Amino acid sequence: MFGIGMPELIVILVIVLVVFGAGRLPEIGGALGKSIRNFKKASDGKDEIEIKPEKKDDPSK
């Protein structure tokens, strides 16, 4: 996983805890989760736009 092991993840978590504080961690985690969900939702969309021609009434009828 990107060359990051358990000791590195623990160090990163401790640094985040010191920088942001324990009170803001749930808020940050929620925002991060929402961002990831939105990114996945956007990337699941179609890459091309489908254009359907409009049906026009035939004036000769």
From Swiss-Prot:
Q: Does the keyword Acyltransferase apply?
A: no
UniProt membrane topology term: Single-pass membrane protein
Transmembrane portions of the chain: 1-21
Q: Which GO terms describe its biological process?
A: protein transport by the Tat complex
Keywords assigned by UniProt, alphabetized:
Cell inner membrane, Cell membrane, Membrane, Protein transport, Translocation, Transmembrane, Transmembrane helix, Transport
Entry's Gene Ontology cellular component terms? TAT protein transport complex
Give GO MF terms, alphabetically: protein transmembrane transporter activity
Q: What Pfam families would the database entry show?
A: TatA_B_E (PF02416)
The UniProt record lists the keyword Cell membrane: yes
What Gene3D superfamilies does this protein map onto? 1.20.5.3310
Q: Which PANTHER family match?
A: SEC-INDEPENDENT PROTEIN TRANSLOCASE PROTEIN TATA
> What is the purpose of this protein?
Part of the twin-arginine translocation (Tat) system that transports large folded proteins containing a characteristic twin-arginine motif in their signal peptide across membranes. TatA could form the protein-conducting channel of the Tat system.
Q: How does it assemble?
A: The Tat system comprises two distinct complexes: a TatABC complex, containing multiple copies of TatA, TatB and TatC subunits, and a separate TatA complex, containing only TatA subunits. Substrates initially bind to the TatABC complex, which probably triggers association of the separate TatA complex to form the active translocon.
Q: Which family would the database say this protein is a member of?
A: Belongs to the TatA/E family.
The entry's protein name is Sec-independent protein translocase protein TatA
Which organism does this record belong to? Geobacter metallireducens (strain ATCC 53774 / DSM 7210 / GS-15)
